């Protein structure tokens, strides 16, 4: 079963890039055409790159690794938090703090402080303090939870990072590359593909596109967790096809072109399986 379908991506607007005047020439090889001044991303390539990224994430998690989900733009915040939480992975969906990876020792101390404040609140540690002291401690706890709450259980730097919008999250990309942590990311037409180890060409501005591709990565994590536990993959974790709006004629044409291509790839394999059976000698009576 395909990890994600062409129709799901078309429904989610994954194929829409930026305006033709706002692009990175290095992305030329991932662009199919332009329409009304907007670049159209080649979703056939996207499918191929999704498979590569999916396999990498699954194997990484299956061998005990963790994936940090990063997306602080409004379009990605909700899906980053919900999908990472669903599969038990750390995430950053508010503000990326400089040194979150390269200076993790200091960040880890702040995490311990957050847990200390939460324990104080739950066990009555705030009692006997002045209102001003309680207010200051509460504000400190709220601020720490807002910026670090998603990585509260991250005991060490992650094995890989999933990023929505490498331009906005340039600090996260730079820190990951400095530590040789593999970067998996959506590549919109204004991104630099040289900064990403496992690129997925697609729209990083549309809410539904970011959510779909984040769900794909989360599903790979879920499958890796199950493989680690020796369980079979949960089919329900795969992205579900949304109803979506009716496709435009040119989008339907893209979809119709994708089907024959998939059939053409499958045909040689089917013929190869059938050939040995046809060549087998007849059994004598």
From Swiss-Prot:
The residue stretches assigned to a coiled coil in this entry are none
The protein's UniProt keywords, in alphabetical order, are: Ribonucleoprotein, Ribosomal protein
Query: According to the lineage, what is the superkingdom?
Result: Bacteria
GO cellular component terms? cytosolic small ribosomal subunit
Region described as Disordered:
228-285
NCBIfam families xrefs: rpsB_bact (TIGR01011)
- PANTHER family, A to Z: 30S RIBOSOMAL PROTEIN S2 PROKARYOTIC AND ORGANELLAR, SMALL RIBOSOMAL SUBUNIT PROTEIN US2M
Can you name this protein?
A: Small ribosomal subunit protein uS2
Task: Name the gene that codes for it.
Answer: rpsB
């Amino acid at each position: 079963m395909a990890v994600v379908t062409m129709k799901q991506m078309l429904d989610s607007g994954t194929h829409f890039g930026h305006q033709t005047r706002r692009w990175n020439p290095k992305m030329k090889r991932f662009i199919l055409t332009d329409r009304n001044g907007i670049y159209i991303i080649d979703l056939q390539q996207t499918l191929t790159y999704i498979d590569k990224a999916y396999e990498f994430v699954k194997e990484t998690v299956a061998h005990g690794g963790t994936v940090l989900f990063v997306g602080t733009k409004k379009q990605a915040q909700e899906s980053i938090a919900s999908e990472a939480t669903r599969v038990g992975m750390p995430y950053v969906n508010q503000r990326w703090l400089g040194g979150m990876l390269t200076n993790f020792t200091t960040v880890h101390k702040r995490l311990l402080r957050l847990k200390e404040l939460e324990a104080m609140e739950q066990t009555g540690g705030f009692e006997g303090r002045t209102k001003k002291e309680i207010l200051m401690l509460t504000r400190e706890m709220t601020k720490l939870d807002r910026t670090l709450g998603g990585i509260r259980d991250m005991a060490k730097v992650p094995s890989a990072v999933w990023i929505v919008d490498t331009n906005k999250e340039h600090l996260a990309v730079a820190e990951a590359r400095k530590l040789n942590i593999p970067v998996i990311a959506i590549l919109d037409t204004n991104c630099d593909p040289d900064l990403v180890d496992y690129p997925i060409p697609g729209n990083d501005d549309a809410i539904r596109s970011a959510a779909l591709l984040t769900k794909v990565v989360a599903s790979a994590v879920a499958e890796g967790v199950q493989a680690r536990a020796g369980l079979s993959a949960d089919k329900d974790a795969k992205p579900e096809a949304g109803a979506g709006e009716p496709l435009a004629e040119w989008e339907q044409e893209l979809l119709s072109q994708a089907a024959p291509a998939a059939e053409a790839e499958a045909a040689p394999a089917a013929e190869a399986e059938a050939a040995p059976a046809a060549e087998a000698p007849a059994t004598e009576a």
